[in-house]
Amino acid sequence: MARKSLIQREKKRQKLEQKYHLIRRSSKKEISKVPSLSEKWKIHGKLQSSPRNSAPTRLHRRCFSTGRPRANYRDFGLSGHILREMVHACLLPGATRSSW
């Protein structure tokens, strides 16, 4: 199980990303539309002044049950070993057992 502080940090990043999503998207569109380089630098500076954790690349997918950030399956939202345990216990409909 992941530490609670790491899970809370990830939730904080998700909130920041949602808050600054429209601002980041609009400033990126402005950069592509503006012809002069000096104006592009100004808009880029505004984009750089936003918080680092508001960038979507800083987010991780985490397992719903354990909070593990690695080996996640998008279809289920679970990490590999939890997915395997749930499939073997017949808790996931439509998933078949495999020996791996």
Curated annotation (Swiss-Prot):
It is found in: Plastid, Chloroplast. PROSITE patterns: RIBOSOMAL_S14. InterPro entries: Ribosomal_uS14 (IPR001209), Ribosomal_uS14_bac/plastid (IPR023036), Ribosomal_uS14_CS (IPR018271). GO terms for cellular component: chloroplast; small ribosomal subunit. GO terms for molecular function: rRNA binding; structural constituent of ribosome. Keywords: Chloroplast, Plastid, Ribonucleoprotein, Ribosomal protein, RNA-binding, rRNA-binding. GO terms for biological process: translation. The keyword Magnesium does not apply. Belongs to the universal ribosomal protein uS14 family. Binds 16S rRNA, required for the assembly of 30S particles. Part of the 30S ribosomal subunit. PANTHER family: 30S RIBOSOMAL PROTEIN S14, SMALL RIBOSOMAL SUBUNIT PROTEIN US14M. This is Small ribosomal subunit protein uS14c. It comes from Eucalyptus globulus subsp. globulus. The gene is rps14.
